[in-house]
């Protein structure tokens, strides 16, 4: 009798769980969200200041160098000059894109366009459509 009750309880609980509506996920544009004064806004502002403090010419140096163009500044060290050159540049473009979508900050927009214009210049110099900062990638 006890086993039958347990089985019945299990069947009822699982069927009730299945009867509930599954949560619906939908995407929305980042610009539809505005952060209020909070730790989240402070974190966003910290990130904004950090990405604008980076020197875009140093992040572009590997791409320009591989394209046969003269860089405007030396590469950053560590990841950017030991075989993964240009790696951070891709993350940087993503960060700028998301920050602009979230804030509409014109300095971020201008920095993003500068990065894209310079990468396009490197791409044109290579002539194959490829853009690469890793040594020997072309």
Predicted regions and their residues:
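Bacterial Sec-dependent N-terminal signal peptides
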Residues: 1-21
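Glycan-recognition and catalytic cores of secretory/periplasmic carbohydrate-active enzymes
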Residues: 20-138
